[in-house]
Amino acid sequence: MPLNLLQDWCRGEHLNTQRSMLILGIPEDCSEDEFEETLHEALKHLGRYRIIGRMFRREENAQAFLVELARDFDYALVPREIEGKGGPWEVVVKPPHSDDEFLNRLNHFLEEERRTVSDMNRVLGTHSNHSPTKTTISADFWVWAQTLGAVMQPLLEQMLYRELRVFSGNTISIPGLLAFDSWLEHTTEMLQMWQVPEVEKRRRLMECLRGPALQVVNVLRANNAAITVKECLEALRQVFGSVDNRKIAQLKFCKAYQEPGEKVSSFVVRLETLLQKALEKNAISRKNVNQTRLKRILGGAILSAKLREKLKMLKQRRRPPGFLALVKLFREEEEEWEATRGSERSCYEGLELGPSPSNIGSEERELFVPAFGSVLEERPYQGSRRRRHRRRGQHRKGGVPRDDSQGTRKQNYDTFCYSCGEDGHIRVHCFNPSNRTLVKQKRQAAMEKGNRSWAWEKSHPKPKTK
C-alpha cells in the first residue's frame, strides 16, 4: 500500500511524515533534469523541498521518489497527480489529523449535497424535536446517510489515532526527540486512552521507537513474541530511566536544600517527593517519618528565628507535625509576610529603586550581612566560641576581664541597606530611594570599626603569664 510505504520510508530516514510525500509512477527512462523540472512546476506553491531518495517498484515497473518539504503544507493544496513523462504521477501524502480538516471536508460534502447540519441531525435522529421513531426517512435520504457514513468513518479513525512521540535512547540529543521521563509519561497516558487490542498498541509503540530503544524491544520480542506493552515500557525504563537505588535516594533527600528564590512551602513539597522515593527504596525508616522530615527542613530551609524555635521545640518534644500541617504552617507564614510587604510596597510605589544586589562590588559583598529578621534567621558569630574559651581561661588563671568598653559589651550587628543606607533591612527588600552618600559613610564607619572587641585583642595582645 503506498501510504504504508511512505510511513516505512520516513521511519527509516527519521523524517516527519506530515512534511513528506511519495511520488509514484515515474518511468525509468525519465532523466533527473526532466524529473526535477516537472516536480518544480507542480510543487513550487508549497515552498522549498528536497529529494531524499528513489527506489524501483516491481509491481508498477516504475520508480518511486521520496520528497521532504521544508515546512508544513496545506493538505488541500497538494496535487493528487502530476502530469509528467509516461503519464500522470501519483502523489501520496499522509492525511492530517486535525479537527479543522475534518470539519472542512464535512462542510464541503454538505455544500455539494446542498444540505445543512440540521438536515443531518434530522436524518440521523439526533435533533431534540424529532424522535427517530417518528421520522420517516426517504430512500434518497437513506442513500445520502450511507454515503455520509462512508465518508466520515475513515476520517473519524484518523482523528482518534495520534502518533506517539519519537524516542531513540541515544545519549546525544537529537532535535525533535524527548527525554525518557517525558516520553514515558506521554506514552503511558496515550496507551491508556486507546481502546484498541494489545497487538495494535504494541505496533504503535514500535512505530515511535528508534535506534537503541528499538533494538531493546526487538530483542524482547525475539525472546517472547507475546510480550505486552506494559512489559516493554518497564524494560525501557530499566534501560534508559534514571538510576535511583537505595543509596542515591538517601543522598538526594539528605542533601536537599532550599534553592534561591524558592518558597519554604515549595521546598517542603519538593522534599516530600524525595522522602517518598527514599521510603520506597527502604533508605529511610518509616517509624519516625515526621521526625525525619522536620529534621531535614530545619537543616535545609531558611526560616525566621521565631519559626525555627517553634519547630525545634516540637522536635525536642517528639511531636513533629505531618506533611500537610507543615505546608499549611509555612503558607500561612508566607501569606502573612506577603500581606505585610504588600502594604509597605504600596506606600513606596513610583519611587526609584537602587541597583540590584548582583551589581554590588566585592568590597560591599564582604559587609553584606543578610539579617532581615522576618525572612532570614540571625546566625551566631563564629568567633563567639573562641571568646568564650578565652574568658574561661582567664578566670582559671585569675585574670581580670576587661571593662565593658573593650570586650564584655553586648554583641550587636550593624546591618544596613546598600541601596538607601537605612538600618533594619537589606537591599533585596528595599523600596526606598537610593542614597549612595549615606551608604558610603556607613561603609567607611564599619571598616574603621573593624571586628570590634576581638580586633582590639589581636592588635593589643596581653603578655603571657609565667
Curated annotation (Swiss-Prot):
Expressed in the cerebrum and cerebellum. Residues 384-399 have a biased composition (Basic residues). A zinc finger (CCHC-type) spans 415-432. This is Paraneoplastic antigen Ma3 homolog. It is found in: Nucleus, Nucleolus. Keywords: Metal-binding, Nucleus, Zinc, Zinc-finger. One of its GO terms (molecular function) is nucleic acid binding. Residues 445-460 have a biased composition (Basic and acidic residues). Pfam families: PNMA, PNMA_N. Residues 379-408, 441-466 are annotated as: Disordered. It comes from Mus musculus. One of its GO terms (cellular component) is nucleolus. Signal peptide: none annotated. Belongs to the PNMA family.
